[in-house]
A protein has these predicted regions:
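Predominantly five- to eight-bladed beta-propeller fold
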Residues: 14-16, 101-149, 194-198
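N-terminal cofactor/phosphate-binding cores enriched in small/glycine residues
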Residues: 1-55, 63, 67
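Conserved beta-propeller blade repeats
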Residues: 1, 35-53, 74, 81-99, ...
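Short loop/turn segments that connect beta-strands within beta-propeller blades
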Residues: 22-26, 68-72, 152-156, 203-207, ...
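Polyanionic (Asp/Glu-rich) segments that form extended negatively charged tracts
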Residues: 245-254, 258, 292-295
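Hydrophobic beta-strand positions in blades of beta-propellers and related beta-sheet-rich domains
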Residues: 18-20, 64-66, 148-150, 197-201, ...
Length: 324
């Protein structure tokens, strides 16, 4: 499965669609007949379904779709108020997790006067108490936070899991498919101490919130081992420097027995994945502008697997690419 992005000269924009092919490159075809923008395809654990995100008819949002491999039929399973991201199947295939921005009420100092009919007024003033309220490439940021949700893979009403007024990112389903492991910065001064995120676990009814890590520095990118006993994650001890190397760590599912996997690799790593037998971890790293794929044992024995990983777009002079 992969996403193909094309430029539409008639609409002066981009369009994206999901394509599928066999491992040997044969039987290459578009997955659906839809003309909407599609993204984020994910195989179900049993390989019988594919979840993906597709834009709505009016292009004002997105919905979660399911494609049934045997029948080649597909359908929306959600009716969301926003656009979902980072969809992930639970291990038992019953649910789909996702993150979504939830807007907050905009700060208003006084009640504005009533606008006369047919009046042409300037836009309302923007009032914010946020330290970070603008971003390069997107301009002013909306008031609100990213939260975690789940929905039945058969469709239905989504359930919001997190509610604290912080951003919740980089999540993973737990072994019993009844909750998430996620990264967030719950510090009171999180806007100023923005690097200091921790890992947490939470049940899918929003209760039983537990903090798993506690140090000065970011912890994120958690992936659960196949047997459900170990969590691998990324992070570093923040020494308040411009650049700091991201390292690989392990801990027990309850947050105990934390240790760094000493790889002797003086490079930041990303994109963790467990091997099926749980004995190795796959990851990516950049070496002198060359993106590589490697694996390591739980004791730090590294094997380089792929060199010269590249992407299909060039936006900035950096390395890149993706691996499945």
């Amino acid at each position: 499965l992969y996403v193909r992005t094309e430029m539409d000269i008639m609409k002066d924009g981009r369009s994206s669609s999901i394509w599928i092919l066999n491992a040997d490159g044969s039987n290459h075809q578009k997955l659906t007949s839809s003309t909407r923008n599609e993204s984020s395809p994910r195989w179900s654990p049993d390989g019988k379904r594919i979840s993906f995100i597709s834009s709505s008819d009016d292009n004002n949002g997105s919905e979660i779709f399911i494609y049934w491999v045997d029948s080649k039929q597909y359908s929306s399973i959600s009716q969301l108020s926003g656009s979902p991201r980072s969809i992930k199947w639970s291990r038992n295939g019953k649910y789909l997790g996702f993150s979504m921005f939830v807007p907050e009420k905009t700060l208003q100092l006084v009640s504005p006067p009533r606008k006369p009919k047919n009046a042409e007024w300037a836009e309302k003033p923007r009032i914010t108490e946020r330290l970070k309220h603008e971003a390069d490439g997107s301009g002013y940021m909306r008031e609100g936070f990213t939260h975690l949700f789940y929905i039945s893979s058969e469709g239905g009403k989504p359930t919001q899991v997190t509610s604290e007024k912080y951003n919740h990112t980089s999540y993973e389903w737990n072994d019993n498919s009844n909750g998430f492991i996620f990264s967030s910065n719950y510090n009171e001064d999180w806007e100023y101490d923005f690097r200091n995120s921790e890992l947490y676990s939470i049940s899918y009814d929003g209760t039983d919130l537990k903090q798993l890590t506690d140090r000065k520095g970011p912890d994120y990118g958690a992936v659960l081992s196949p047997d459900g006993n170990l969590i691998a994650y990324l992070g570093y001890d923040d020494k308040i420097q411009t650049y700091q190397t991201t390292n690989l760590y392990l801990m027990d599912i309850n947050g105990g027995n934390k240790r760094e996997i000493k790889t002797n690799l003086d490079r930041s790593i990303s994109s963790l994945e467990w091997s099926k037998d749980g004995k190795r971890l796959y990851f990516m790293y950049d070496d002198e502008g060359n993106t590589k794929v490697a694996s390591t044992s739980l004791y730090g024995n590294i094997k380089n697997l792929v060199d010269n990983v590249g992407g299909t777009t060039i936006g900035r002079p950096y390395g890149g690419g993706s691996v499945s």
